[in-house]
Structures are given as structure tokens and as C-alpha cells.
A protein has these predicted regions:
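N-terminal charged helix/coil linker that caps or initiates catalytic domains
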Residues: 1-42
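Generic structural signal for residues in well-ordered beta-strands
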Residues: 15, 134, 142-144, 305-308
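Gly/Thr-rich phosphate-binding beta-strand-loop-beta motif of the actin/hexokinase/Hsp70
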Residues: 28-64, 167-180
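Glycine/GP-enriched mid-protein hinge/lid loop-to-helix segment characteristic of carbohydrate kinases
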Residues: 65-67, 133, 139-245
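Glycine-rich phosphate-binding loop and adjoining helix at the ATP-binding site
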Residues: 66-91, 95-166, 285-296
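Adenine-nucleotide phosphate-binding core of ATP-dependent small-molecule kinases
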Residues: 77-95, 215-218, 223-284
């Protein structure tokens, strides 16, 4: 019966009593919720120049995390550091390894449906046997995920989005995801959401993909950090101070280019657009100005509140 199953789950420590619903005339119904720390998972994010490891519980609360600047190399030295940092976080927080559900590894690459193969990668060099190479250093179950899809799902789940939403990731590369609730539309070839390769300037700057004029060439984080020796935080600190006209002009140009892409996404999907990634984390102070730039390109609306 339902009651017996609920009691069994409580005894196992998987669920707990969270109060009662308001009465609708009869006996008040009990509210049960998942015990968030019953299980946990690790996320490993690998980019061109950074490694991030995050431990989360079932409610997506961050238990522990570590981010470090280290250029990616498919070498023993790099993976030994990854293994050491992974073990340090897990050992410090999990006494019983059976509580660890597994590991999601996000990569700036197009991932196969089996989540074990990389079908396209140019941002960082990945060999064909990269999945098995990981097994020399990580001994818990793990799967590969596209970086922007991972970030988009996290935003969707944490923000409890139920409608369609576009996530635009602005980091060392530009990517994204189109989500309907908590489901990603990956497309026929798992390339849905590769917004970084929308052409915004025909015959423009060279992109890492080999084409010219891609959004990525204009709006990845390097478009800003190239002027502060790779330090994004420093760029926005100088920008906030408001005295460096060069930095101000660079950011204005960045927002103009980004507005072209955001307007195109709005025309295509007609839903909210979340600006994420490393640059997106700094955009809150400039969101009103950016919305004004975007709606100037929009023939249908003058309210830019769909940009978040």
C-alpha cells in the first residue's frame, strides 16, 4: 500500500515529513519531501583554462566546490590534479561513498547520445578514447555532458522554469540550450543550442570553428578579458569604476553584438532568454542598458524583461 511504501522510504531515510496541507474539509494530508542529503553528486566542468568541481545534494544545494585556473591538457599531470581535487572534495564531505550517485563531466564539445562519446570538439583537444582515459583517474560512474546544456538544465531546475526558455552561455566559448520545462531540445544531431555559431557579422572575425563572423568570435569572455590579461573580474571592476573609456567602449561594442544575437533568439523561440556563463554572472548591473539595446532591434515589443 501507499502508506507501507511511505513508511519504508522514511525508514530508509529517503523522505521526511514536511508538515501538512491545508484542510479541504477532511483530514489534513501529510506533506513528504525528499531528504536532500540522502544522496549527492559531483559535477566536473572542464574548460580551456579552468577546472571546476562541485558537490551538490538532491535539492541542487552546493555542498562544496573548487575552481582553479589550469589549462586543459590530456596528460597524466592534468588528470592527476583533477583526481586529487576530486578526492579532496569527496573525502571531506562524504563518509559513505555509496551516497555518491555519480559524476557529470561537462565539456565544451558536442556529446553523443550515449554520453560517452565526443562527436565534435575544437575548443579543447579531446582524443577519441577520452572517456576511457578518465577511468584511469575517476573510479565512480560518470557521464559526459555538453557544457551549455548542463548549465541550462541547472538554471531551469534551480529556477523552477516550467515554460520554454533559452539559455545563452557566455564563457570562454559561447553556447546555449533551448529548454521546454526541464527537457532540452537537442536536435537531430545533438547540436541544438549551438548559438555561438550564429553568424552576426558576415565575413567578420575568424571563429575557432574555422568560419567567419560567428557570435562566439565577438561575445566569448576573451572578447573582454584580452584587455585585462585574462581576468574577467578585473575587467568588470574597471568598467564599474567608469573612468576607462577604452574598457567602456569595448563593453558597449560587446553588448551591441550580443543584442543582435539575443534579438535573433527572441524572434526564433519567442520565450525568455537567460544570460549565463562567466560573463552572464556579471551582467546584472548592466541588464537594463542591455535590454534597451535589444528591444531597439525588436519590431514587436518595447519591453525587454524577457532577458534575464
Amino acid at each position: 500500500t501507499t502508506t507501507r511504501n511511505l513508511n519504508a522510504l522514511q525508514e530508509e531515510g529517503m523522505i521526511e515529513n514536511a508538515g501538512e496541507f491545508e484542510s479541504t474539509g477532511g483530514r489534513k494530508a501529510t506533506i513528504y519531501q525528499c531528504v536532500s542529503n540522502y544522496r549527492c553528486a559531483v559535477g566536473i566542468d572542464i574548460t580551456r583554462n579552468h577546472l571546476t568541481i562541485v558537490l551538490i545534494d538532491l535539492a541542487l544545494n552546493i555542498i562544496d566546490s573548487k575552481r582553479m585556473r589550469i589549462p586543459f591538457r590530456e596528460t597524466h599531470e592534468y588528470f592527476s590534479i583533477l583526481q586529487e581535487e576530486f578526492e579532496a572534495i569527496v573525502s571531506a564531505n562524504i563518509a559513505d561513498r555509496s551516497r555518491l550517485l555519480g559524476i557529470g563531466i561537462s565539456l565544451p564539445a558536442i556529446i553523443g547520445e550515449d554520453h560517452k562519446t565526443v562527436t565534435y570538439a575544437t575548443v579543447i583537444p579531446l582524443s577519441l578514447n577520452i572517456y576511457s582515459f578518465f577511468s584511469n583517474y575517476i573510479h565512480e560512474p560518470y557521464l559526459f555532458f555538453n557544457d551549455a546544456n548542463s548549465a541550462g538544465l541547472a538554471e531551469s531546475w534551480k529556477g523552477d522554469y516550467t515554460d520554454s526558455v533559452v539559455y545563452l552561455s557566455l564563457s570562454s566559448s559561447v553556447g546555449g540550450a533551448y529548454m521546454n520545462g526541464r527537457s532540452i531540445h537537442a536536435g537531430d544531431n545533438n547540436r541544438g543550442g549551438e548559438f555561438g555559431h550564429i553568424t552576426i557579422v558576415p565575413h567578420g572575425k575568424r571563429c575557432y570553428c574555422g568560419r567567419n563572423g560567428c557570435l562566439d568570435a565577438y561575445c566569448n569572455a576573451n572578447a573582454l578579458t584580452d584587455f585585462t590579461e585574462g581576468n574577467l573580474k578585473e575587467f568588470f571592476e574597471i568598467l564599474k569604476f567608469g573612468k576607462n573609456k577604452g574598457i567602456i567602449n569595448i563593453f558597449n561594442e560587446y553588448m551591441e553584438n550580443l543584442a543582435i544575437a539575443v534579438n535573433s533568439l527572441r524572434m526564433c523561440f519567442d520565450c525568455d532568454i537567460i544570460l549565463g556563463g562567466n560573463v552572464g554572472a556579471y551582467m546584472s548591473d548592466y541588464l537594463d542598458d542591455f535590454r534597451k539595446k535589444a528591444v531597439k532591434l525588436n519590431p514587436f515589443e518595447k519591453d525587454g524583461s524577457y532577458i534575464q
